[in-house]
């Protein structure tokens, strides 16, 4: 089973396009994440979403947003202009969750549950157990 979960930051605005045959939406964007060690450079990865998720990606996520992305990791062979082939990793997303927004708004700040009402526990002698 190929299952991949990654926390990363969007570094390029998502680009929406449609397939030629049946006009299925496809959205691609680039994310960045820290290397394995503190002194390692940051790594980048192309993320692809299909169908309804593609539309959601385009409408919702922007550079600077930190996301948790779940999906499948694949390798693509790319023909370079220099005349050689290069393998590149690509994450096909199945689910995306916003960790925090690049505009400074945390998802928890957008809508928070109501505060619970205070309960008076000063007279606990009347409790039957």
UniProtKB/Swiss-Prot annotation:
Q: Where in the cell is it found?
A: Cellular thylakoid membrane
Q: Which domain of life is it from?
A: Bacteria
Q: One GO CC annotation, please?
A: nucleoid
For the keyword Ligase, the answer is no
Entry's Pfam families?
SSB
Keywords on this record?
Answer: DNA-binding, Membrane, Thylakoid
Membrane topology annotation: Peripheral membrane protein
UniProt xrefs under CDD domains: SSB_OBF (cd04496)
**Which GO molecular function annotations are given, in alphabetical order?**
enzyme activator activity; single-stranded DNA binding
Q: Does the keyword DNA-binding apply?
A: yes
Q: How does it assemble?
A: Homotetramer.
SSB domain span: 1-100
Q: What is this protein called?
A: Thylakoid-associated single-stranded DNA-binding protein slr1034
- A GO BP term, please? DNA replication
Q: Where is this region: Disordered?
A: 99-129
């Amino acid at each position: 089973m190929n299952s991949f979960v990654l926390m990363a930051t969007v570094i390029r605005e998502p680009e929406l396009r449609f397939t030629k045959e049946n006009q299925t939406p496809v959205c691609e964007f680039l994310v960045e994440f820290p290397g394995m060690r503190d002194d390692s450079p940051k790594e980048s990865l192309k993320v692809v979403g299909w169908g309804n998720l593609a539309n959601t990606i385009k409408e919702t996520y922007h550079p600077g947003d930190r996301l948790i992305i779940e999906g499948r990791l694949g390798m693509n062979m790319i023909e370079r202009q220099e005349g050689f082939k290069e393998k590149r990793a690509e994450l096909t997303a199945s689910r995306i969750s916003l960790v925090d927004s690049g505009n400074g708004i945390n998802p928890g700040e957008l809508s928070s549950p109501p505060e619970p009402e205070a309960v008076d526990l000063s007279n606990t002698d009347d409790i039957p157990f």
